[in-house]
Amino acid sequence: MFRYFYLLLFLFGSLINRAQNNEQAYFDQALSNGKVANEAFRRSHHFLQGWLTKADPATGLIPRNLTQSTCIWNAWDAAADNYPFMVMTASMLDKPLFEGKMREILATETRLTSRVGRLPDTYSFCKKAFENAEIDTSQIVFGSAEYMKDGLIPLTEWLGPSPWSERMLGILADLDKIVDVPTQIKGSFFGNSAVVEVGGDLLQVLARMYWLTKNPKWLAWGIQIGDYYLSEAHLPTRALQRLRLRDHGCEIVSGLVEMYAVVSVVNPAKKKQWQPYIHEMLDTILAKGRNEHGLFYDEVNPLTGEVIQKRIADNFGYTLNAFYTVYLIDKKAAYRDATLKALSALNANYRNHDWESGSADGYADAIEGTMNLYLREPITSVKEWLDSEIKVLWNFQKPDGIIEGWHGDGNFARTSLMYALWKTAGTQLSNWNQEVMYGAVAEKNAVYITLSSPKAWSGKLVFGGQWHKQNLHLPFDYPRINQFQEWFPIEANKSYELTIDGKSLNVKGSVLLAGYPLQLKPQQTIQVRCKR
């Protein structure tokens, strides 16, 4: 009898030791994650500081780029791709700058660039006036759509309602007065796919702004554009001889699927009407748009299957977001299989790949899209690829913080911040300090966080929430461009077991979301476990 008792006691003790060893391994990994997260944060902050030195002294606006167009701010580049991620960086890492200079730039941009109502046009620092004497409606429509989708949407995903979401809703309201379904964008500057790009931009904006506001006007407009494209006459894979599966064209695929996700919840009859067209479009892209690894070509003819541009699209993840979303809605396994095939090919075949003719932007977009999908399908080799490729991206940064000196530099910060939030499991410091190392590991029902600092620090550890729900009111967290991944989302109304250096207490989720107070002494390391 006693022999069995001691055996059980021994086994129980062994299990406890194993659990403790596993937990310590998680805390050790969290510390390692904190080192790379810290580098991502520092590089993003350095980008912000570098670009602020290039701002126009009179207006405070940043130029379109540093090699040409140095005298202008435009909606579809400076406003859409660079400035928003300066704002985002400041919101995480430099609160005084966020509340001050970043808001000032928004106010100045709104005052100086609004030309047709609240719709922005290109502003010249040198002329102290609009760059073009005459109003070019195509340029204004294109710039407005790009500013909303690429710039103001990600800020709203991160911040929720804010002055930037108000700017977007103002642009959207005034754009509604001059366009319904965009069918003509004049000017060769915008490439061969400007019409579908603007249509896709609007669909993505309308889908998310409908959920944010519940304004039926945005739903009706989105359905109007969806009805146009999801039809016998205008389905992109039937009507287009050139279908771009990279940015500046692939937006239409993602946009149609985002609006499909909306109607799948609020209008089942419309969802049923659109479903055959959505599936046909995606099936055609799978049949004619991929290479042997399941990644997409830059551009194909969907009618003949001709590959027009054989370069592999760095935006493959954006298009796969659409496939995975339809998989979530319709449970069509082929769309998940397509995602898994592409992801599984990355580490073996696309390390240090030349995504966009040597540009950092190609790496930034490829990494962002992959992180979205890795959240849903955590394949080990994908983690290895992400950890490898972020270093390739970081090598583009110059000593002054500038990346390549054009508007695409903003995407460097966007992706670096996303990477850091992965390595911190969505947690942040209320008052970021570059000397404080903190990282996390999310494992099933718990997140393990390690913090250390060479100097004393006090502040709050802010946990990540269900951003899709609390910021945009989305009904489910489908993969989408410009979202911020939820690695360990805290729910405000639930209770969690918080253990700090071995001492446990129950804490409401709302407290964790607001930030839990912590203090670090010089050279101290703190281990925090949060358990569902």
Model-derived segments and their meaning:
Residues M1-N22:
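Bacterial Sec-dependent N-terminal signal peptides
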Residues Q20-C530:
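Glycan-recognition and catalytic cores of secretory/periplasmic carbohydrate-active enzymes
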